[in-house]
């Protein structure tokens, strides 16, 4: 069993979870079943990933009374998509996720991004020129609607994803249910030290997405640095008899940062949770800390006039224009 962090709600959140972004239907069900069989007790989902129905099939077969895993031992996260920020749309969006996942409640529900897209069922509403159609709903209004889900017992904890420090404080200024978790891209090239400190001072735990550098994403640039080929990481892997991925994950869990590596390959799913039986010295941690160069891999891109441009960078609530 992976060790945990304790949320301010009293919930235990396992430090390693299975990520499901880019896990295709047809593959994700077997991946979840295998992950549960080798001790994973944390699954990270999102409505926009388009695979919650199949994840739900895996959960129905393996979780609950008389099944391999009791429901109360499993920590399931999902995320509210940008088209569902309007307060009138929030509960219905959650209920669809619960129905798809075949669950009665979520352990954690995150606002996926701070800004809202145009309301409706097309997840990426676009103008004729390829740019996104936005909605003016502010995340503080969305947060109030999310709080009602906790009161109804549909969600145990709320959190944020891709919010910067200023936006987190903005939520805290209006929250009666305080966010418990911030989920952001985080790895040695983007260590997020300031943001993590900011969260810890305010009672939020941090989850790292793309903790291995997300080399399989669509808008990858051919000459960008490859985290899994970083010499410092390879040297530590050789020294400890571990894989490069295990080195990257151990660094995070030793910092008490939750990780959600995505894999559909059984050998890698198993490897990714085997990071609790070795430890880095302070010097080894410093070697990995020194790799930080504020390199962000995950910036959603769109094609406008034949050019690839950041999808949302012009939006006033875009989170990544701030230092952290």
Curated annotation (Swiss-Prot):
Its main location: cytoplasm. One of its GO terms (biological process) is L-ascorbic acid biosynthetic process. The keyword Amino-acid biosynthesis does not apply. One of its GO terms (molecular function) is glycerol dehydrogenase (NADP+) activity. The record marks 79 as: Lowers pKa of active site Tyr. It catalyses: a primary alcohol + NADP(+) = an aldehyde + NADPH + H(+); L-gulonate + NADP(+) = aldehydo-D-glucuronate + NADPH + H(+); L-gulono-1,4-lactone + NADP(+) = D-glucurono-3,6-lactone + NADPH + H(+); allyl alcohol + NADP(+) = acrolein + NADPH + H(+). It comes from the Eukaryota. Its EC number is 1.1.1.2, 1.1.1.372, 1.1.1.54, 1.1.1.19. Gene3D superfamilies: NADP-dependent oxidoreductase domain. The modification N6-acetyllysine is found at residue 126. Catalyzes the NADPH-dependent reduction of a wide variety of carbonyl-containing compounds to their corresponding alcohols. Displays enzymatic activity towards endogenous metabolites such as aromatic and aliphatic aldehydes, ketones, monosaccharides and bile acids, with a preference for negatively charged substrates, such as glucuronate and succinic semialdehyde. Plays an important role by catalyzing the reduction of D-glucuronic acid and D-glucurono-gamma-lactone. Functions as a detoxifiying enzyme by reducing a range of toxic aldehydes. Belongs to the aldo/keto reductase family. This is Aldo-keto reductase family 1 member A1. It comes from Cricetulus griseus.
């Amino acid at each position: 069993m992976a060790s945990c962090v304790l949320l301010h709600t009293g919930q235990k959140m396992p430090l390693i979870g299975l990520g499901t972004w880019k896990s295709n239907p047809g593959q994700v069900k077997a991946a979840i079943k295998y992950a549960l069989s080798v001790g994973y007790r944390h699954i990270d989902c999102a409505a926009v990933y388009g695979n919650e129905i199949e994840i739900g099939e895996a959960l129905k077969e393996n979780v609950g009374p008389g099944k391999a895993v009791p429901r109360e031992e499993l920590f399931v996260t999902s995320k509210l998509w940008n088209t569902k920020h309007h307060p009138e749309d929030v509960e219905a969006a959650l209920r669809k996720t619960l129905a798809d996942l075949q669950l009665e409640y979520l352990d954690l529900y995150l606002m996926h991004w701070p800004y809202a897209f145009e309301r409706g069922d097309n997840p990426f509403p676009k103008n004729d020129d390829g740019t996104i159609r936005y909605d003016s709903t502010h995340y503080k209004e969305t947060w109030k609607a999310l709080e009602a889900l906790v009161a109804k017992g549909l969600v145990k904890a709320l959190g944020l994803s891709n919010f910067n420090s200023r936006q987190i404080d903005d939520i805290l200024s209006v929250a009666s249910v305080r966010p418990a978790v911030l989920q952001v891209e985080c790895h040695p090239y983007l260590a997020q030290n300031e943001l993590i400190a900011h969260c810890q001072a305010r009672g939020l735990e941090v989850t790292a997405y793309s903790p291995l550098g997300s080399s399989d994403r669509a808008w990858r640039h051919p000459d960008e640095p490859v985290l899994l080929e970083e010499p410092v990481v390879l040297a530590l892997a050789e020294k400890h008899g571990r894989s490069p991925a295990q080195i990257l994950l151990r660094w995070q869990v030793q910092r008490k940062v939750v990780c959600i590596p995505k894999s559909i390959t059984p050998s890698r799913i198993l490897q990714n949770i085997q990071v609790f039986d070795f430890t880095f010295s302070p010097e080894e941690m410093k070697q990995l800390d020194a790799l930080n160069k504020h390199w962000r891999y995950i910036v959603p891109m769109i094609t406008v006039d034949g050019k690839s441009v950041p999808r949302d960078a012009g939006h006033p609530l875009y989170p990544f224009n701030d230092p952290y």
